[in-house]
From Swiss-Prot:
Residues annotated as binding S-adenosyl-L-methionine: 101-102, 117-118, 153-154, 176
Localization terms from the record: Cytoplasm
Protein name: Ribosomal RNA small subunit methyltransferase J
A GO cellular-component term linked to this record: cytoplasm
Length: 259
């Protein structure tokens, strides 16, 4: 994939080149999107809209840290959806990891979470954020133990993983495909910014329906699909149950009991 690759820290140019090689990124000087390695972090910028600011993964501070400390623990909807309230601590594969926020919440509650992000730029951002989180004095130890990013950023990532001899099937597959956002629905400024940038970078998630069948084959216990409250079921398949929040819905497809 082509994108502008820029290093603001001369000492990190070789790191940027390694990132580009790992995720298959090629430098395009004129690209509207830039992946920028600063002294602190890897960022995505939309060069024709500088007011949008930079997008980067922060698992240590800000909203993510607040949610970890005050988000409701195992009583929150996402925890119930993956079965944490049943006394189990499932192994979860997050098939649409994005910026890693939901995966981080599940890991903070004790789950081992394998993350798959198919878009190489988003995967590179997540990889950088994960590396920084592992260095943090407060959360680094358990982040390193419980969170991993699988290098599988192609459309058929789930099928590829199942074909690997050493792949251990997860108890739960978690999916949160990007969904078109109606104009009249309110979102926070941060989420609006990210959605705008991501939808113009990644494009519409037109093949999201195709994720459900391989997810159901992969998960030994259940598949959880996060949807906006106004969205139809993924692949038009009715879930076993749904857990509703103010703005979202967790559709749960049960393969087996959590015990």
């Amino acid at each position: 994939m082509q994108i502008a690759l820029l290093s603001e820290d001369p000492n990190r140019q070789s790191e940027l080149e390694a990132i580009a090689a790992r995720w298959g990124l090629k430098h395009d000087e004129d690209n509207v999107f830039a992946l920028v390695l600063t002294e602190q972090q890897l960022e995505l910028r939309k060069r024709d809209e500088p007011k949008l600011g930079a997008i980067f993964v922060d698992l240590v501070s800000g909203a993510v840290a607040h949610r970890r400390k005050f988000g409701g623990g195992k009583g929150q909807s996402i925890a119930k959806a993956v079965g944490l309230n049943k006394g189990a601590t499932p192994i979860v594969l997050d098939g649409t990891a994005g910026l890693g926020r939901d995966a981080f919440v599940l890991a903070s509650l004790g789950c081992k979470v394998q993350m798959v992000e198919r878009h190489p730029v988003v995967a590179a951002l997540l990889d950088d954020g994960l590396a920084r989180a592992k260095q943090d004095a407060e959360i680094g130890v358990w982040v390193a133990e419980r969170m991993s990013l699988l290098h599988a950023s192609s459309h058929d990532a789930l099928e590829q993983l199942m074909a690997q001899d050493d792949f251990v099937q997860p108890d739960v597959v978690y999916l949160d495909p990007m969904y078109p956002h109606p104009v009249n629905k309110k979102k926070s400024a941060l989420v609006k910014k990210e959605m705008r940038v991501f939808q113009s970078l990644v494009g519409a998630d037109n093949d999201a329906d195709a994720l459900l069948a391989p997810a159901l084959l992969m998960a030994t216990k259940r598949v959880v699909v996060k949807r906006p409250d106004y969205a139809e079921w993924l692949d038009n398949q009715k879930p076993s149950m749904a857990i509703e929040t103010k703005k979202n819905r967790f559709d749960v497809y049960v393969n087996a009991a959590m015990a």
